[in-house]
């Protein structure tokens, strides 16, 4: 026996779960994903989401509503007569009529150990906070922000130099396997739900551009966590001297280093940079419009000497 599912997701993070559920033999009655977005240099092309593209490869029915608030859209959803909805990084709020519009409810794959890091950016926030462990969770959704009871958990270690991009790729695969297991248990009537703890709640606010600049006055560990937590996107950045101008450069990889100096000062030609306490060594950088390069390759073109100040 298999379940009739509605899948709701948008970015690449969601795609492995969609493919895994389809591969497990479940009937995917519809895909909900965000509408195509303008792309290209002039924004004249419309680009379908990664989930939309995967759904078309799987020959699945796709819907791209701007909102799920209208009675008309909610009626369409109910008429799908799905057993359950699976939601992974969809990006739209689900009204009660949608949450209650299937026989068994809506189940969300969330990239944190709830109730820590409820919200939009749990992967980035966990690394930026210096967390050493995170995890994927499947929860049954309610009307709150990631407040529903927990069905399944898989813990994942965060390495000391792991970037958000690397953790994202580990978690999207873990989340796929976890959701398949949860839906199998749901199908058998064996999925147990546990309320979230009332303590330990934190919120993973969406990353905004105003917080992406590196503050070299902070301790080295905080700077390092900031760099790797924002890598590769949107990318932490600083300004470096470029002739008589300043050049904005993204910092994609770093590691903790020894040494001291004024905050932002280059303290050796291997791109160790002094922080408020300690130092970080830059390992990978990216100029505007360029490709990511190693620190050694970057230095061949820039030659940032000792005493140079980054801001």
UniProtKB/Swiss-Prot annotation:
Its EC number is 2.1.2.9. GO terms for molecular function: methionyl-tRNA formyltransferase activity. CDD domains: FMT_core_Met-tRNA-FMT_N, Met_tRNA_FMT_C. (6S)-5,6,7,8-tetrahydrofolate binds at residues 112-115. InterPro entries: Fmt, Formyl_trans_C, Formyl_trans_C_sf, Formyl_transf_N, Formyl_transf_N_sf, Formyl_transferase-like_C_sf, GART_AS, Met-tRNA-FMT_C. It holds the Pfam family Formyl_trans_N. Transmembrane segments: none annotated. One of its GO terms (cellular component) is cytosol. Keywords: Protein biosynthesis, Transferase. It comes from the Bacteria. Belongs to the Fmt family. Attaches a formyl group to the free amino group of methionyl-tRNA(fMet). The formyl group appears to play a dual role in the initiator identity of N-formylmethionyl-tRNA by promoting its recognition by IF2 and preventing the misappropriation of this tRNA by the elongation apparatus. This is Methionyl-tRNA formyltransferase.
